[in-house]
UniProtKB/Swiss-Prot annotation:
Assembly information from the UniProt record: Part of the 50S ribosomal subunit.
Alphabetical list of HAMAP family matching this protein: Ribosomal_uL30_B
Gene: rpmD
Organism: Laribacter hongkongensis (strain HLHK9)
Similarity-based family: Belongs to the universal ribosomal protein uL30 family.
Signal peptide: none
Origin organism lineage: Bacteria, Pseudomonadati, Pseudomonadota, Betaproteobacteria, Neisseriales
Protein name: Large ribosomal subunit protein uL30
């Protein structure tokens, strides 16, 4: 798995009061709590979810 590219995603804003599709994108990326960081594969599907909630998350790599 070391040959595949990954992206670190951190949830920096709360999901309280957000629409359901934004909450679903965060859950799909594995983000549950504020300031939680997960490492996901750099795929078009994950990039789309990150793009949809870009105002809630911080990306690295």
């Amino acid at each position: 798995m070391s040959d595949k590219k990954t992206v670190k995603v951190t949830l920096v804003k709360s999901l309280i009061g957000r629409i359901e599709s934004h909450r679903a994108c965060a859950r799909g990326l594995g983000l549950k709590k504020l300031n939680q960081t997960v490492e996901v594969l750099d795929t078009p599907e994950n990039r789309g979810m990150i793009n949809k909630i870009s105002f809630l998350v911080k990306c690295e790599g």
